[in-house]
């Protein structure tokens, strides 16, 4: 199962730059991180689910690209985001 609407709303509210912000890199990375964490839990139980693992790798790649973009454009926002989400550099 994916994230519920309530969970997404909480993540958006926490990482949004303005009240109606849903598309900033911070929000997108936070949502991708939540989905990645959810799928990681799935793989602890279903080790042979290679099809979903391929989707996980795409999500990780997409998150990496967004983080690289944010790092190029505004390094301080990037550093704040990885600290808030607990991601390594």
Swiss-Prot record:
Q: Which BP terms from GO are recorded?
A: translation
Task: From the UniProt entry, list the residue stretches annotated as the region Disordered.
Answer: 1-25
Supply the PROSITE patterns for this chain: RIBOSOMAL_S15
The record's section on InterPro entries has:
Ribosomal_uS15, Ribosomal_uS15_bac-type, uS15_NS1_RNA-bd_sf
- Keyword Disulfide bond (UniProt): no
Lineage top rank: taxon: Bacteria
Keywords of the record, alphabetical order, are:
Ribonucleoprotein, Ribosomal protein, RNA-binding, rRNA-binding
Checking Pfam families in the record gives:
Ribosomal_S15
A GO cellular component annotation here is:
cytosolic small ribosomal subunit
Enumerate the GO terms in the molecular function aspect.
Answer: rRNA binding; structural constituent of ribosome
CDD domains given in the database record = Ribosomal_S15p_S13e
Q: What does this protein do?
A: One of the primary rRNA binding proteins, it binds directly to 16S rRNA where it helps nucleate assembly of the platform of the 30S subunit by binding and bridging several RNA helices of the 16S rRNA.
Q: How does it assemble?
A: Part of the 30S ribosomal subunit. Forms a bridge to the 50S subunit in the 70S ribosome, contacting the 23S rRNA.
Please state which protein family the record places this protein in. Belongs to the universal ribosomal protein uS15 family.
Name this protein carries in UniProt: Small ribosomal subunit protein uS15
Recorded source organism is Alkalilimnicola ehrlichii (strain ATCC BAA-1101 / DSM 17681 / MLHE-1)
Gene name as annotated: rpsO
């Amino acid at each position: 199962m994916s994230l519920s609407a309530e969970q997404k709303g909480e993540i958006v509210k926490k990482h949004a730059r303005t009240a109606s912000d849903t598309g900033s890199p911070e929000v997108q990375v936070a949502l991708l991180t939540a989905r990645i964490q959810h799928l990681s839990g799935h793989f602890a139980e279903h080790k042979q689910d290679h099809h979903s693992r391929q989707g996980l790798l795409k999500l990780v790649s997409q998150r990496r690209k967004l983080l690289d973009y944010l790092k190029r454009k505004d390094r301080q926002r990037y550093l704040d985001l990885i600290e808030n989400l607990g991601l390594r550099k």
